[in-house]
């Protein structure tokens, strides 16, 4: 279950597990967010299906805040058990600011265990830190093995 936003408009620190239906209900409160959810749903299905076998995805960025019109969403996917040969190659294309990912799925995806360039922390940890303040913040976790997409 996803908790209420804090006074900064963010989720409290930690990974907040939710179902796909909860994510749609909680974060789909504007037409822009509905559009982003459409792309995210396609991406989640691609990570889960086609024998890729991804089991967990974590959602971050302004999408999991009170911002009414986020530009996109940021996500990282757990590499454990993933069949890279079955993975949509766009999930491994980080060129040109991840333009191909944004064009296809309206968001950006990173392997959760890959280090973020500037900080050196893996994306799963990097996503849980506010870039401006350095304080801990919350993200949303999805268990794709249980997700009904």
Model-based region annotation:
Residues 76:
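Aromatic/basic-lined ligand-recognition segments
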Residues 1-60, 64-71, 79-149:
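Catalytic core of pol beta-like nucleotidyltransferases
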């Amino acid at each position: 279950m996803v908790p209420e936003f804090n006074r900064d408009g963010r989720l409290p620190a930690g990974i907040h597990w939710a179902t796909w239906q909860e994510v749609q209900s909680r974060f789909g409160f504007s037409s822009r967010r509905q559009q982003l959810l459409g792309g995210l749903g396609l991406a989640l299905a691609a990570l889960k299906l086609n024998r890729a076998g991804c089991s967990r995805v974590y959602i971050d960025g302004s999408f999991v805040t009170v911002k009414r019109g986020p530009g996109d969403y940021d996500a990282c996917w757990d590499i454990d058990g993933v069949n890279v040969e079955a993975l949509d190659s766009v999930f491994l294309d980080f060129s040109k600011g991840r333009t191909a990912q944004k064009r296809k799925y309206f968001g950006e995806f990173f392997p959760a265990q890959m280090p973020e360039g500037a900080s050196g922390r893996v994306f799963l940890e990097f996503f849980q830190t506010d870039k401006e303040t350095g304080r801990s913040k919350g993200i949303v976790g999805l268990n794709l093995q249980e997700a009904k997409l």
